[in-house]
Amino acid sequence: MATDGASCEPDLSRAPEDAAGAAAEAAKKEFDVDTLSKSELRMLLSVMEGELEARDLVIEALRARRKEVFIQERYGRFNLNDPFLALQRDYEAGASDKEKKPVCTNPLSILEAVMAHCRKMQERMSTQLAAAESRQKKLEMEKLQLQALDQEHQKLAARLEEERGKNRHVVLMLVKECKQLSGKVIEEAQKLEEVMASLEEEKKKTNDLEEQLCTEKRRSAEMEAQMEKQLSEFDTEREQLRAKLNREEAHTTDLKEEIDKMKKMIEQLKRGSDSKPSLSLPRKTKDRRLASVSVATEGPVTRAVACQTDPVTESTDHVRKLPLTVPAKPSAGSPLVSANTKGNVCPHAAPGRPGMDRQASHGDLMGSSAPTIPAASASRMEANGPSPGSTPDLTSSTPPIPSGTTPAPAHAPGVATQSPVPAAPGHGLHSPCATTALHPGLNPRIQAARFRFQGNANDPDQNGNTTQSPPSRDVSPTSRDNLVAKQLARNTVTQALSRFTSPQVGTPPRPGVPPTGDVATHPPVSRSGLKTPGGARVDRGNPPPIPPKKPGLSQTPSPPHPQLKIPVDSSRASSAGAKVENKTVASPPSSLPPGSRVITEENPPKSSSPQLPPKPSIELTVAPAGCAVSALAASQVGAWPAETLGLKPPACSDSSLVIPNTIAFRSSINPVSASTSRPGASDSLLVTASGWSPSLTPLLMSGGPAPLAGRPTLLQQAAAQGNVTLLSMLLNEEGLDTNYSCEDGHSALYSAATNGHADCVRLLLNAEAQVNAAEKNGFTPLCAAAAQGHFECLELLLASDADVNHAADGGQTPLYLACKNGNTDCIKLLLEAGTDRSIKTRDGWTPVHAAVDTGNVDSLKLLMYYQAPARGNSSNEEEPESGAFARDGGEESSEGTSEPVVSADLINHADREGWTAAHIAASKGFKNCLEILCRHGGLEPEKRDKCNRTVHDVATDDCKHLLENLNALKIPLRISVGEIQPDNCGSDDFECENIICTLSIRKQTSWDDFSKAVSQALTNHFQAISSDGWWSLEDVAFNNTTDSSIGLSASSVRSITLGNMPWPAGRSFAPSPWDFVRKNKTEQVTALLSGPQEGCLSSVTYASMIPLKTLQNYLRLVEQYHNVIFHGPEGSLQDFIAHQLALCMKHRQMAAGFSCEIVRAEVDAGFSKEQLLDLFISSACLIPVKQSPVKKKIIIILENLENSSLSELLGDFLAPLENRSTESPCTFQKGNGASECYYFHENCFLMGTIAKACLQGSDLLVQQHFRWVQLRWDGEPMQGLLPRFLRRKVVNKFRGQVPAPCDPVHKTVAWALSVWRQLNSCLAHLGTPEALLGPKYFLSCPVVPGRAQATVKWMSKLWNAVIAPRVQAAILSRASVKRQPGLGQTAAKKHPSHGQQAVVKAALSILLNKAVLHGCPLPRAELDQHTADFRGGSFPLSIVSSYNSCSKKKGESGAWRKVSTSPRKKSGRFSSPIWNEPDLSPGGIKNKAISQLNCGRNTSLSKQKSLENELSLTLNLDQRFSLGSDDAADLVKELQSMCSSKSESDLSKIADSREELRTFHSSGSNPAFSAPVNNPRMPVAPKEVSPLSSHQATECSTSKSKTELGVSRVKSFLPVPRSKIAQCSQNTKRSSSSSNTRQPEINNNSKEENWNLHKHEQVEKPNT
């Protein structure tokens, strides 16, 4: 057909075909299918089928031969044999001529169609190919993963095989161990029966032994009573002999003293004295209660001389004597005073001190009505100024007066120095009345010489103590021979002069001339005290005593000046009278007022004179006129002068003038020297008023200071020196100008105010002196008093209407001067007087400038805040107002209670340089002053000076920081952990919020700065509570292993709240933080940590102080293993950790779209397996096999699993819990009896908590089916939990600040930590793990700054409520572990035997002293008061060594005798804390044996009686407590080793406080042990006693009952056979080697004893 189609010849047959086709078309038009017959229809159908087949063939041909498509166009007609022709025919017949188009009109179109089709097919094929390639790669990856899974499966299978093999081995071992234990139980039961049988036999023996012991006890009691009786008799006899000895010594001393006086009297009579020898030597009282005892090491024996100012007690004479140290045995060359003075020596005076003490009690010194008589050794200060020892610079300013030219005052009345002759005590010290007749015809030079040599005779005594002399360099204890020679020479001259001074007949006495026998000046006391060579040094600490009242100008005598203190017994009585020159001196009647004396004389008329007191302190300063003052000017006035220079008659005339004497003010007086001197002033008023005779003046002036000037100058001098007596006499004169001013313009009032003499100021003001008189610089007395800080003078001047606002030439006001010198009292007084605070000086300074310039904070506070109260209620308002500025300037703001009273203009006032007070404070670095200024609201810190500098520009670094934080807002930053639930998980002690620091928000603070500050504060806080850098704990080993980080950071914060408004970290609001905080009145910033609600554990970490990584690890274990149990000691926060982990898991699952439920069940003793099954089924954790798995997450927490047996409770659930699938079902029977198969699904988590340190027995079978998390007390996280928690508690207590290392709170918290650790360490050492405590109980430790007592009380409550009961239960549980099974352990706990009670009390006492009381921060006295609050604290155990760091190693010979020798202290001998003080002396050994009550007694083995009621000793071993068990013996050993470790005492020293023990020894005991044996309280027992023997010897406390320093030990009750000595000795060596007391090993030949309990054999052998 292709050939035909391809031919180029024309087809001749087409024409007839066309004609036939046209006819057919015409027929077709008329063709009707309905009219066709059946055959036609069949033919038509066959034709159509043929055409269809032809079409199929064409399609197939076209597909096979595509080239023919391009050839079809050549053919115009087709043959009938060509199937293509049929297609052409159908085409032409089916359409009109217009629509007909050739099939292959264009080969290109056909090619394009084919190419388009091919392109589509190619794209489809490429797509399918890429998909096939991707499927191939995926398949290869799946193959690789499958291979890896296969390998892992193989490894896991191998590992499971290993675990199965190990488990099988463990099970076999456990089965074998169970068999062994069952066999041991049977053996022990048999042994128990044998022991019970032997106990019956032993009871008989112990009864006999008890009878013997009772007999020995009675004998011992009798011997003890005899010994105590003898001791009492010895004590009584010793006291009697001592009293008799004292009486004899006193009598001997009195006799020696009388002999010395008689010798001196005879010697005086031999010299032919002109005085009357008929004066009788008065007798002394025989009261020997106050006899003094001489000291041999103090040189010559001295006796005290009575003083006139001592109070009258039991004397018949009322004349007081001055205490003065005189030699009891004078040398042969002792000089004598003149015969006209006589005195007595009191034998009952205590040894006196040469010199004076400024700290004399004012009440004791002012109590006497007699005048003040100074010691002669002190008058040297009056005549010559301060001693060189006290004022070494005196020689550079004022030349010293030579001893040859300056006389000393005569003897004080009633004082005899180195002479037995009684002195004339007729009147007061400064009385002008003459008692010795001086005749007017006497030459003044002779009188002065006589006075001089009499005065110098008193300079030194035999001890080298100078009494009255100018500064001399050769007066010392090493030059006594020289002194004696000088005294002899002086007394020789005195005897020669006495002829010229004898009374002359017919010569009237000179009026106003004081006698030489009564001319004595009272010495002042320098600021640094007197120092005499060879004498005791005077105390120079306190100022002179303050007089009880101030003297006025009344005409009544005032009390005398307080006597300068000399150590004299105040209770002694002076019993000496005196007669002077036929003038009988009578004691003053008791009805007279204090300070007055009645002088009764036979010849002269009666006259009385006031007692003129001295000033208590003297300092030489420059006088206003610039001249030096004589030393005599410093003395007090004692008499009026003679009628010379036209002055008035003296005071001792017939008309007596009573002038009040005045006690100087309490402050040290600085006298001002006289201004000028002239030759005519030798008899000036000041000299005669001082008690010196005018005839002595020329001698005084030679080589001494310049003479004094006239009356006005004297007035100034008296006012400057505070000489009230002289001042009052001068003011009483007529015509004296009280307002006289010297060259500098200083008036008398100004001088008195400058030196602070308030009494002189009062006198001058009463004399109408000008109160506002100014000196040449414009300063008034008020200015001077304010500048010097003389408060009383200021009060007087203000009361006299002084000008309070007076300004000097420079503009200085009194307020300015007071602020400049920091006198706060004066400032307050001036402010109350209404002074103006704004007055400026010439330089522009105000009082505020002056206060700031000196840096005086108190002065500045007064100026700014003190509001002067109203005149009517000033005294009432003074206290509350003072509180406004008396607060600490740096911590609290004064605006809280008061507002500044000064204006802003005054605070901002600038001086000539433009500097304000703030400039001054900032430039000098006075931060406190600047802070007070900044509190004023009107301060302008930006104010500039003339150099254009602000306060910040001139400030120091500290002040710059203060200015930068001037207006900073202080906002506390808190950390919140949200709500910790539930409450029964131990969360009561967890604080929800803690203040960590205070944020400072300034105006320029941005939100970025604020965010950084918050982050930095959080980071610093987390580091502070994690690190131990600021913490000092005893146990360094614990801290070395502690992780220093808890894993928290700033990113742990979930949200931050400013007040009540949340603030996303890093976000910036429109207002600045400053404006935001002020606008919203934000009081705090709270940082909320992410918690379990967010699926995090940060808040749990902060609340519990468990590191975050640890908690995350726990959470991973729960999610991975599904079955986890937390176990540890009670109080290890197991429940809290489990519940918080469950909460975190719940919120995580809920966030993932799963529902979750937490089921908590508390297991108690009655919780059964059926109840647990119901719990699993009801919570849908255990589901039937037929039921489909649930998608709900279920978390079950079983708490307190230690209350039941794990094997019984969880035994049936172990297999389904381990294999959670339907392939491993387990059949459980319900309560109704129906059984069904159940299984645990994968969405169930089981957590349990056990308050037990370790598992025992059958519970170990459960261990392999759970993942166990052990919370050890000595490992993380429990180890560092308590330190971190308490550290955070301290930081919160101090409001975010870490306290100083010296703060006592550190010691308190460190003590609480050490108690927990030492307690657990001791309990672990005892082998009682069930008594271990977790840190939960110690989380409530109170942190009270400065009050450690609260922590000790809390510790006592914890000890009594928790620790002690647990320890008791653990000890009883262990001690009764091998008792008879029928009795039961519970019965032993309820009714413990006496031996068990003894062991428990011993253990409690050891734990209390070793773990609790050791390291307590309280002082020992306070700790002893709190010890009784602890249970077991009264047990008689040594607490000295346990409280101190180490026990005492040295013996104290008299330690025990001090408390036990007296029978009265017999009952309290056990309470004396001297158990660890061994005594090596024989007596000490004997007494120590008594005190320790046979410390070798075996406490745990001897079955002690009750510590409360029983007194008798028994060795009956109770049937309920067999100490033959291994556990009991081990417990005793551990108690022993615990006592011997560190500073603890040995357990063998524990003794029953109500029982007395006896020792038994053999005749062969060594001498070292003979002392305790010979003690009458310890009778000797028989040599051989049947011991308690056994198969196995158990080491007990007697193996260590030796004394600490190697002294032979006190023995136990029974001896040990010879065969057991070697073993006992080895035990002794082994136990002693573990002790820190370094005891030497005991010789094997010494007596060694041990307890052997199992009585199977009896051996009777004596010890060797």
Swiss-Prot record:
InterPro entries: Ankyrin_rpt, Ankyrin_rpt-contain_sf, Cortactin-Actin_Reg, Cortactin-binding_p2_N. Residues 1587-1600 have a biased composition (Polar residues). Residues 119-276 form a coiled coil. It comes from the Eukaryota. Residues 368-379, 395-407, 1625-1639 have a biased composition (Low complexity). Residues 1-23, 268-440, 455-479, 495-618, 871-900, 1447-1483, 1558-1664 are annotated as: Disordered. Keywords: ANK repeat, Cell projection, Coiled coil, Cytoplasm, Methylation, Phosphoprotein, Repeat, Synapse. Signal peptide: none annotated. One of its GO terms (molecular function) is protein phosphatase 2A binding. It holds the Pfam family Ank_2. This is Cortactin-binding protein 2. The gene is CTTNBP2.
